[in-house]
């Protein structure tokens, strides 16, 4: 009886490790994807509402446009491509919408990504998925593009904050 109980306890304790070992690549992608959404949302909350129209040069996107891009293309479309899950209809977003509407939309889009990435399995990463411009890519490629896109746009938002005399979230002391 003692031996059986010990074996069962060992199996229960080891089970999470076995499960994690079955998806090392998708677990790595999920780990990368956990940090950036918070930084991006914090940056969106940090920028004053009256600065959402700010852009460093006429050719660049406004801060509000960056947020809209993240909501629509950067999150719903990319996370859908990476996971194979159909994205919900996000509704309409314009760069001139209120800060509150844009931040709420941004949070909702990241929630979809969190749910989509939670389902991602290594066995699916080589599956083909539709991508921008009618191209086909692998789900793994789409997942990596998503995480890279978040890093790119967070750095963009951080620069916009600094140009307006504000510290980006990752530059603040805890």
Predicted ranges, named:
Residues 95-130, 137-153:
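Acidic/histidine-rich alpha-helical segments that form the ligand environment
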Residues 25-29:
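Disorder-to-helix initiation segments
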Residues 6-17:
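Bacterial N-terminal signal peptides
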Residues 30-41, 51-91, 130-174:
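Short, contiguous alpha-helical
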Residues 19-21:
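Boundary at the C-terminal end of the N-terminal hydrophobic targeting segment
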Residues 39, 43-44, 78, 109-117:
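Well-ordered alpha-helical scaffold segments within catalytic/enzyme domains
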Residues 48-52, 82, 118, 122-125:
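Short, flexible helix-adjacent loops and helix caps
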Residues 1-5:
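Positively charged n-region of N-terminal signal peptides that target proteins for export
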């Amino acid at each position: 009886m003692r031996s059986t109980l010990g074996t069962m306890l060992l199996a229960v304790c080891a089970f999470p490790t076995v499960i994690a070992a079955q998806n090392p690549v998708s677990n790595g992608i999920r780990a990368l994807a956990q940090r950036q959404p918070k930084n991006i949302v914090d940056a969106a909350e940090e920028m004053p509402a009256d600065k959402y129209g700010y852009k460093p040069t006429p050719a660049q996107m406004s801060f509000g446009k960056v947020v809209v891009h993240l909501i629509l293309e950067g999150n719903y479309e990319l996370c859908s491509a990476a996971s194979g899950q159909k994205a919900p209809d996000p509704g309409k977003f314009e760069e001139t919408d209120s800060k509150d509407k844009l931040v709420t939309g941004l949070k909702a889009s990241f929630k979809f990504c969190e749910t989509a990435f939670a389902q991602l399995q290594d066995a699916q990463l080589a599956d083909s998925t539709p991508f921008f411009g009618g191209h086909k890519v692998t789900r793994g490629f789409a997942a990596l593009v998503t995480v890279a896109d978040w890093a790119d746009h967070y750095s963009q938002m951080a620069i916009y904050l600094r140009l307006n005399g504000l510290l980006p979230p990752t530059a603040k002391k805890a």
